[in-house]
């Protein structure tokens, strides 16, 4: 435990080179944990363990930030930036910090020769941020409606680097989306189809972890397209981004079902969708290894659009307060939500996402189907298995319906990817398989009924007896051709009976035995049973008629006696 706390402290220290905003501290400066929390700096609250690819919440650091007396009961606004690694997320957040510290100034963006400090960032091709970091100074802002809110800025580990699995990327993105009120999805140059598919996977992983699923579980998603190179098609900024996003997320009838599902999923996950097109910052930024964020090295187009973007997210009138399940979230509440969510991702309840949501969802649902079907089969074996006696068909059907409902409830209780519509197909598959299994249990149970087992020989014997009687009668009155035909049928029935007995005794020629059973079943259902039912119905009708006649006769006799008297 002491070692873990030490590791956490040094990770916070390493990620906090700029302890005071605007000042740079040397790496070898010794700063205790209390000083770190007093000075503005990035603090890692979700630690990424590369050895086992697990994540750990630094509860102490999070509580020190969010449970300060002056902010803990304020509603919170969480602005997070997520996306692929080495795409300038931390760089953007540092300009957000400049705005938060100087929002009342027209020149909040800073001076031309002022280095960019705050969240640690650098040029190059290797990742910088791991896990999830937040700025340890929570900004208290007065809203136009007179209320105060707390604003927290969040930086996330870049996705798809060489050291992170798909599960790592999904966990970080899902956690940041679940806990933020505005998620900035940082992309380079364009919105490609794989960007949308990854977004679908990551948001589904977040939706799955939430206990109650509402129609739109997340709040605002802002697509930020960096290095936009087509201003002649869609202009820089919010309006051009809106037009571009509408085209990208449009659901068309001639689209493949997979493409339609991705777009429907994104629309169903977020209450608000936006897009901002940002130009390239310039060659000096991209190619100069010593670039430190000075505005003089950044192109004017980029600076102009940056002045529009940051207030769009952080101006008091534009702030989006965090809500979960329709209720506002305070700083104190957010601590508890972080604790609850991280436990879910540390456990084994959730399926591990793969490269495509569809594959994971199919495997997940098929496993749920198999488990529910197995539960049904084992329970039915206890009712009418091989060592159980014959059970009345009505009782068997009642047990079947009860156990089927149990199996469906089990299927529904399993956490599944894909959404209700996708899972419904697998529930239908489960119900169909259960009905097929039930049909086999019916046959198995009927085989234990001595009368059912004797149905084939009884039917054949009845045919032989009927043919014998008819043959005798027709021969007596001179209809020899009919008598010969009846004798032929009687001989055929006797042959079937002997063959059936041999098959049952020896176990050979089972196909022939099955065919004889089917013939006997058809004769029973189509001829003998209806004939017997008609005879019984006629007998019952005759009995009722006789009873009515007898009753009427008694009444007439009774009235006649009364008149005589």
Curated annotation (Swiss-Prot):
Residues modified as N6-methyllysine: 252
Keyword Transmembrane helix (UniProt): yes
Cytoplasmic topological intervals: 1-458, 503-565
Chief location bin: endoplasmic reticulum
EC number: 3.6.5.-
GO cellular component terms listed in the entry, alphabetical order: endoplasmic reticulum tubular network membrane
Chain positions covered by the region annotation 3HB (three-helix bundle) domain: 356-447
Lumenal side: 480-481
Residues the entry annotates as binding GDP: 86-91, 157, 226-227, 285, 288
SS bond partners: none
Topology class, membrane: Multi-pass membrane protein
Residue ranges that the Swiss-Prot or TrEMBL entry lists as coiled coil: 238-266
Compartments in which it is found: Endoplasmic reticulum membrane
Domain remark text: The GB1/RHD3-type G domain mediates GTP-binding and hydrolysis as well as homodimerization. The two three-helix bundle (3HB) regions in the homodimer are loosely associated initially, but they tighten upon GTP hydrolysis, facilitating the fusion of membranes.
Function (record text): Atlastin-2 (ATL2) is a membrane-anchored GTPase that mediates the GTP-dependent fusion of endoplasmic reticulum (ER) membranes, maintaining the continuous ER network. It facilitates the formation of three-way junctions where ER tubules intersect. Two atlastin-2 on neighboring ER tubules bind GTP and form loose homodimers through the GB1/RHD3-type G domains and 3HB regions. Upon GTP hydrolysis, the 3HB regions tighten, pulling the membranes together to drive their fusion. After fusion, the homodimer disassembles upon release of inorganic phosphate (Pi).
Name the record gives this protein: Atlastin-2
Species the sequence originates in: Macaca fascicularis (Crab-eating macaque)
Lineage per the UniProt record: Eukaryota, Metazoa, Chordata, Craniata, Vertebrata
Gene that this polypeptide is encoded by: ATL2
